[in-house]
Amino acid sequence: MHCAQYAAGRCRSCQWLDKPYPQQLADKQHHLESLLAGHAVTQWLALVFGRESAFRNKAKMVVSGSVERPLLGMLHRDGTPVDLCACPLYPPSFEPVFTVLKTFIARAGLTPYNVARKRGELKFLLLTESTYNGELMLRFVLRSETKLAQLTAALPWLQQQLPQLAVISANIQPVHMAILEGEREIPLTEQQALPERFNQVPLYIRPQSFFQTNPPVAASLYATARQWVQEHEVHSMWDLFCGVGGFGLHCAGPETQLTGIEISAEAIACARQSAEQLGLKNVSFAALDSTRFATAEAQIPELVLVNPPRRGIGRELCDYLSQMAPKFILYSSCNAETMAKDISLLAGYHIERVQLFDMFPHTSHYEVLTLLALRR
């Protein structure tokens, strides 16, 4: 993949771009195998990868420049703006949208936030595309509500130019820190969730809910989890750190007792919407802390699925699972190092199978799916 900004030394987000893609994959596989070298793995499955470019469904654009000539992209370490509208990670459909958004910023009078001067209003634009129907979700991250009325008044023009814009919101982030978004989200359209569909499973993305940024590889990840679970005829399961419910909704059959737990109420609203659409009657989702929920339960399901943030599931949850001993633990991780530490704490389990999914080409990051079975 060629990137003009990388070649010019202006962007280093893809830190492995100089490395041939087959070598990237080999290095990731070697890294994972070295982390699990102290464990007996019954089956290593071939790694899964997708496109090298144009795979990202989401753009996070810093807004800089002036209101008349806004720039969308990032700030270089020296503070100068870098235009990323032509970033090769984005699908071709994004660049014309960015062109319209630049015009809209000027029309609406949304002054870009100046980090050095701590002045201005518009900090970021967050754009997400549905691979299911091509609809877009757009979030304006603002310092305050000062320009909200101007933004709202100008929206009809934007919606006329971009009819695929289905979900629009404003996020208020008043802090002068490198924080992408604040807690307060103000919906600006009646529709508040972007529909997505992986493997015939309907999923929904709300402004403040996490969703995978590489849809083709994410679809493979979910399909693999479903296959592994179905092979063991699991009748009851927990989906902890469940997000919008992608794993649990893929794995649950009509009779499966599924409980999904996620701290984000926005994500849980998405999961419930999907479960209702699928007609699943034995499924419940709740906005709770996954560790607190689990450790307060006196009974355990046959399978516990965990998909934690980079920090892993931690000692408390590992100790609880070791004590309660579900038949299976299905661990999906975006940080194999913390996953390996957690697995070392899970007493009484062996690794049945492991598979790497290259969700993040041109970086050292990857996703890994591991099935742990209770030793008999």
Curated annotation (Swiss-Prot):
PANTHER family recorded: RNA M5U METHYLTRANSFERASE, TRNA (URACIL(54)-C(5))-METHYLTRANSFERASE
EC number(s) on file: 2.1.1.189
Enzyme class: transferase
Binding site for [4Fe-4S] cluster: 3, 11, 14, 87
Catalytic reactions of this protein: uridine(747) in 23S rRNA + S-adenosyl-L-methionine = 5-methyluridine(747) in 23S rRNA + S-adenosyl-L-homocysteine + H(+)
NCBIfam families: meth_trns_rumB, rumA
Cited function: Catalyzes the formation of 5-methyl-uridine at position 747 (m5U747) in 23S rRNA.
Keyword field contains Protein biosynthesis: no
PROSITE patterns: SAM_MT_RNA_M5U (PS51687), TRMA_1 (PS01230), TRMA_2 (PS01231)
Keywords: 4Fe-4S, Iron, Iron-sulfur, Metal-binding, Methyltransferase, rRNA processing, S-adenosyl-L-methionine, Transferase
Record: residues binding S-adenosyl-L-methionine: 212, 241, 262, 307
CDD domains: AdoMet_MTases
Family as reported in the entry's similarity comment: Belongs to the class I-like SAM-binding methyltransferase superfamily. RNA M5U methyltransferase family. RlmC subfamily.
A Pfam family matched in the record: tRNA_U5-meth_tr
Biological process (GO), any one: rRNA base methylation
Active-site residues annotated for this sequence: 334
Keyword tRNA-binding recorded: no
GO molecular function: 4 iron, 4 sulfur cluster binding; iron ion binding; rRNA (uridine-C5-)-methyltransferase activity
SUPFAM superfamilies: S-adenosyl-L-methionine-dependent methyltransferases
Name of the protein this chain belongs to: 23S rRNA (uracil(747)-C(5))-methyltransferase RlmC
